[in-house]
Amino acid sequence: PVYTENADQNLTNLPYFKEANIPYARTHDSSICYDYGGEHTVDIINIFPDFDADPYSPESYDFTLTDMYLDNIARSGARVFYRLGNKIEHWPKHYGIMPPKDFKKWAVICEHIIRHMNEGWANGYNRGIVYWEIWNEPDFNNKCWTGTPEEFFDLFEITAKHLKSCFPEIKIGGPAVCRYNADWLIPFFEEMKKRNVPMDFYSWHCYSSKVEDFIRDTRLHRALLDRYGYNECESILNEWNYVCGWSGEGWKKSLATELSIKGAAFIAAVATACQHEKLDMLMYYDARINSTMNGLFRPGTLEVRKGYYPLKIWGEMLSSDGECETLC
């Protein structure tokens, strides 16, 4: 959501968020958006810019614009789903997606971000943020993680165990994989099981032009969780949208469809289909107001697009605490 107390250029979409009863806002890629605080927001390298600094000192952290951004999410009525890590980097030079120099120190930094947000540390807040996600798409072709899979397995283990020992009451999970890739996922789950790594939720992504692909992947990911003993772990699809191709005319058609009535119908269809699967949460990508994949809000004016309405209707059903049956 966008909100500012400036005297000018102060358009907001908070009323639309409230009306749609959107339950969660995920913070991933928020640092790509100037209106959210840009390169001073959410990501570990933005909040803790000098990795050689003291992670136990409040002076090492810059929470200012992240706090403002999370305040706006609270104003919208949504709860925060916080991604610990860094935004995607499509550039030829990378800045925040390399393996941290010290995995344990990185976990301690994450700990103090949570303490600031939930326990008031460093002039902080008591936001009660429950979901804390470790990284994003570590399996995605050096755009989110430049290290090896084995290095990521170590980072995930160290961070999950440390955070769970500090905060047993919150939910720790991840790693927001970009797709169902058994060659990456099976070694990940084998290591997590062998090392007894706690995982309260498991997050994953799916982009497709076919509703049945979302059903298929939901079942595949759930089967992996159950196979490796994570039977009580939540399965969360927290990036999804209509995509029929990632380049050329396919990508052009994808973006056009996301803004169309067909894109809106697709949102409703996927949400409805997944309602009948063993899936705990869906998070549409993207409501970021400068994103070309945003089928909900127009850039600049922040007026709603067609894709907003199925989410609004879903929010109404969420308030009724039950699925609505239609008789034809």
Report each predicted region and the residues it spans:
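Active-site mouth loops of central-metabolism enzymes
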Residues: P1-D8, M98-P100, K253-A256
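Boundary/entry segment of secreted carbohydrate-active catalytic domains
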Residues: P1-S31
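Short alpha-helical segments and helix-capping/turn motifs at coil-helix boundaries
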Residues: E5-L14, T64-M68, H116-E119, P187, ...
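Substrate-binding cleft and catalytic face of glycoside hydrolase catalytic domains
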Residues: A20-V211
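Helix C-cap/helix->beta junction micro-motif
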Residues: S76, C166, Y228-N231, E277
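Glycoside hydrolase catalytic-domain groove-lining segments
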Residues: D200-W251, A273, D280, Y284, ...
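Aromatic/acidic polysaccharide-binding cleft in carbohydrate-active enzymes
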Residues: N241-C328
